[in-house]
């Protein structure tokens, strides 16, 4: 039996941020990642301004990302820039983001083991099986993504109601960076083109109960063909998203952060920012139970509004009218910045 003060399952943005904060405070931290490589995940890899304000002070180099001004099109309307400042998006490969965060966490003193899945979580005994032995924890942090084993062990529902699909096409610089709402085909989901330094992510996201994953893939394939994007030798990537939030702190020293906690916006599908801030503030609450969590609180307030609008847009009777309203707002100069702020600034 191995005893660990803080055991983190999952080495994504949330888990590595938890690890970094706890290790910097002098705590014993072990992170277990089931995948052999840390970082890769189905994700457009977009960092909004608020996300960059989290990562830059941590040491993310200025040349690690590609900066692009984002465009948006509502309901078949033309592509517009809502606000050049607020819609500036930095793109980074998740492999690269994981590499930087791994460096920061290990530099702070955390132990991170990749290729080590965990099983047999026993919340009563505070133990888990990993690497052929039992590990006992004082605090268990589930940062293990949408299909979280820790979330399941807590008995929380895990509907994972959204599905994202993408192709990461190497050597392609397809511009501009854009999001296109296409309510006739993918309901309240959207299509994206996110150029990176070495590739372009072309993808789409939608609720599974309205647009089946197989239908979303066919839609994405059709959009790629329309853009002249070859998919030869480019693997299709798909993943479910958890947007149902039930809390971050639970009895018995168990905590959830990031996708495992369901903090993704069901409107924008933005998840990296929420993973970083919940990871940081879960760690700070472990260190000081009465510590405030202002960034998490603010984000959850934004998420609630996003989720309400997303549910509204899921209704066929109101979808077209609402997207039409957004298209009108996007054509009204003095309304563009407030809309961009609400969607992206949180």
Residue ranges and their predicted role:
Residues 309-346:
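C-terminal auxiliary extensions adjacent to catalytic cores
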Residues 12-13, 37, 145:
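Residue-level detector of alpha-helix initiation sites
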């Amino acid at each position: 039996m191995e005893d660990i003060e803080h055991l983190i399952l999952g080495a994504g943005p949330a888990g590595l941020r938890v690890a970094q904060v706890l290790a910097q405070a002098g705590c014993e931290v072990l992170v277990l990642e089931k995948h052999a490589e840390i970082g890769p995940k189905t994700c457009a890899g977009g960092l909004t301004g608020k996300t960059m304000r989290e990562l830059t002070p941590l040491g993310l180099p200025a040349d690690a990302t590609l900066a692009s001004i984002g465009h948006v099109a509502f309901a078949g309307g033309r592509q517009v820039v809502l606000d050049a400042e607020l819609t500036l998006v930095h793109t980074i490969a998740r492999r690269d983001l994981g590499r930087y965060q791994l460096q920061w966490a290990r530099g702070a003193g955390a132990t991170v083991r990749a290729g080590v899945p965990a099983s047999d979580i026993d919340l009563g005994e505070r133990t888990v099986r990993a690497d052929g032995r039992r590990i006992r924890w004082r605090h268990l942090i589930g940062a293990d993504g949408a299909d979280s084993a820790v979330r399941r062990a807590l008995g929380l529902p895990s509907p994972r109601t959204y599905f994202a699909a993408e192709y990461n096409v190497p050597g392609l610089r397809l511009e501009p960076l854009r999001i296109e709402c296409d309510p006739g085909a993918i309901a309240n989901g959207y299509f994206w083109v996110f150029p990176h330094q070495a590739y372009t992510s072309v993808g789409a996201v939608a609720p599974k109960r309205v647009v089946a994953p197989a239908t979303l893939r066919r839609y994405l394939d059709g959009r790629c063909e329309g853009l002249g994007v070859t998919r030869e030798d480019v693997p299709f990537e798909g993943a479910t998203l958890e947007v149902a939030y039930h809390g971050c702190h639970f009895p018995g020293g168990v905590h959830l952060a990031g996708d495992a906690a369901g903090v993704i916006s069901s409107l924008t599908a933005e998840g990296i920012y929420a993973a970083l801030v919940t990871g940081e503030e879960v760690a700070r609450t472990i260190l000081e139970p009465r510590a405030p969590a202002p960034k998490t609180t603010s984000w959850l307030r934004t998420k609630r509004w996003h989720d309400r609008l997303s549910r509204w847009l899921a209704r066929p009777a109101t979808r077209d009218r609402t997207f039409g309203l957004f298209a009108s707002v996007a054509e009204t100069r003095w309304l563009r910045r407030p809309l961009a702020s609400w969607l992206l600034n949180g």
